[in-house]
Amino acid sequence: MVQIVSQDNFADSIASGLVLVDFFAEWCGPCKMLTPVLEALAAELPYVTILKLDIDASPRPAEQFGVSSIPTLILFKDGKEVERSVGLKDKDSLVKLISKHQ
């Protein structure tokens, strides 16, 4: 299941384990197209927590991590950024990106 986070709980949400964060905005077309891909990833890769952060409602984490284009996906391992992907990606590409850090 993909969960929505805010800037208030962002740091705690990425602190442990493997966490993929989708930095998105409600008005972003490619972001909307990415949602079913993330849902499929969540079902296929239960060892990864998948989160979505609305950069308009919660801008601080996006600023902190230098997110300037959306969708941006950042993979965190125990709170540290290990991978970044900008733009719409297919499920297979994201599985490869994540599996390197399993």
From Swiss-Prot:
* GO-annotated cellular components: cytosol
**What is its biological role?**
Participates in various redox reactions through the reversible oxidation of its active center dithiol to a disulfide and catalyzes dithiol-disulfide exchange reactions.
Which Gene3D superfamilies does the record associate with it?
Answer: Glutaredoxin (3.40.30.10)
Cite a single GO MF annotation.
Answer: protein-disulfide reductase activity
* Domain of life per record: Bacteria
- Cysteine-cysteine disulfides: C28-C31
Q: State any GO BP term from the record.
A: cell redox homeostasis
Concerning InterPro entries, the annotation shows: Thioredoxin, Thioredoxin-like_sf, Thioredoxin_CS, Thioredoxin_domain
Q: Where is the Thioredoxin domain?
A: 1-102
**Name of encoding gene:** trxA
Keywords of this entry: Disulfide bond, Electron transport, Redox-active center, Transport
What does the similarity note say? Belongs to the thioredoxin family.
Query: Where does the record place a coiled coil?
Result: none
Name of this protein: Thioredoxin
